[in-house]
Amino acid sequence: MDMQDFYTGHAFDAYEFFGAHTYFGGTHFAVWAPSAQHIAVETEIGTFDLHRTQSAVWECDAPGVQAGMVYQYWVRGANGRSVAHCDPYGTAMTLRPDGHSIVSDAPKGFADDKWMQERTKCFDKPLNIYEVHMGSWRQKEDGSWYTYAELADLLPAYCKKNGFTHIELMPLAEHPFDGSWGYQTTGFFAPTSRYGTPDELVEFVNACHKQGIGVILDFVPVHFAVDAYGLKEFDGTPLYEYPAAAVGQSEWGSCNFMHSRGEIRCFIQSCADYWLRVFHADGLRMDAVSRLIYWQGDPNRGVNGSTLEFLKGMNAGLQQRHPTAILIAEDSTSFPKVTAPVEYGGLGFDYKWDLGWMNDTLDYFKKTSDERRENLGKLTFSMMYAWNEHYILPFSHDENVHGKATIVQKMYGEYEGKFPQARALYLYMAIHPGKMLDFMGNEFAQLREFDESREQDWMVLKYPNHDDFHRYRRALNEAYLANEAFWSREYDPEAFRWLDCAHPELDACAIWRDGHDGAVLAAFNFGDTELADYTLTLPRAGKLTKLLDTDWQCFGGRTEKPKRLVGKACGGELKLTLAPFSGQLFKLV
């Protein structure tokens, strides 16, 4: 690493220099702490003083210190106090509540060359993401966590069977508080030891790639945990954070990174590069991007110019270094060109969560049938801006916590009546332009909100409503994967049209999606009464195949699945009978 690139914020490989690096017979330690008065590294075999270089870097060789040994820095800061800190660039840590770093060699064992060579950003491919919290997807009988290696035998196969293309893992970087779900970090380069070692994480990623499942990691570039052994006041001064409390503290009580400083930019973007390069992650979903666009995420306070420049520089560098990795923004603002390349004035992301679509859609499905007739615009409005960005439609963990209720519980009505509405909702999600993301448990209509301390309620699958819903979601995902009209022209406005959205009094609408080899269309009745003789005028005639009816008995509905689904010639008109709260999916070739 060129130190000038470190100070100016241009380096992406700071982890190659900083941190603990073993050599034959010992370990080299290096840490940046410009205002420190003295630093020593305490190891299992003794304490070693670091010496300060002219570049404000402290370093030393520690003979006899080997991989697997625990260490921490004692930093006497500018205020004269000595505080124990974990290594900012440490690549492994001990389990909370302990906060020591562990000397760790680079993980080995990847066997995914073919996957890495052939992966794409999926612009014209299916992208159906399963969001997972590793500690609570499944747990052992005694309530303990599965390890990365143990999950390698379970999670990729489950995703493959259920029609998901990628797993998105809530933050794996080491964090002290389970209830933060990983979003308040102390060890940015260290996979959490809750689930095992870095080598075991490699085993998990290998298993995913072997099954054809991509791995996207949540990445937190905005803020960090306030725990004293972490980054806060690392050298006795606000080094990684803003000195002013007005902008230095986030709404979550954590410390905001000072992105205007080159060394901090280098730290964050090197961390992003580390997860992509060392662990073969297929993408990063960047958390709380609105806080990087506007001061404290508030448009009324104006654009934060320095963080915008950081974001552009980081994304441009990551795109160059990892051209097939997927960069996703969790951004609730209307700031333009989030998914445009930096060279064209954009922020350089590949995708952006469509949180407007999510809010409007769920608000619509919370309403009674009568109220829906007056609010069809909540479903149609998203198409007014659908082509402005590359969107992902998210039903994330945020919509399953804090009293918001799970997706199925958000549906209007009582228990039995929620399931047909949820089936129609997910068909609407699939036919709407945009890639898809769904949080664990939604696929079998979990009723209980997310709790990081408990595994998902798999026992509900013994009840017919949940088992049928799970079967339906698998069939819908299979239809999505098998029919390229869902995704091959995802961001082409000419490939979409409303077949009907002009009769809100019917609680009905219909959508047409063109592909390269045919089309798919879906018709919906979001009302509580049967809709007979619902007639649609099609853009062209062809051979019609019914792919799916959300009201089929095999999915928990009342309609018997016909024995013959294919080969029906269709002119320019289609006449349907739609059950209450249902949708029907067709393919036309």
State where each predicted segment sits:
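The feature marks proteins involved in alpha-glucan
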Residues: 1-28, 49-131, 136-143, 150, ...
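Conserved, mostly hydrophobic/aromatic
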Residues: 31, 73, 132, 169, ...
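Short proline/glycine-enriched turn/loop motifs at strand-loop junctions of beta-rich domains
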Residues: 32-38, 539-542
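C-terminal beta-strand-rich structural cap/linker in extracellular carbohydrate-active enzymes
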Residues: 67-69, 561-589
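Conserved alpha/beta catalytic core and glycan-binding cleft of carbohydrate-active enzymes
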Residues: 97, 280-282, 297-455, 481, ...
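Substrate-binding/active-site clefts of carbohydrate-active enzymes
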Residues: 114-126, 133-303
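Catalytic cores of secreted or luminal carbohydrate-active enzymes
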Residues: 465-486
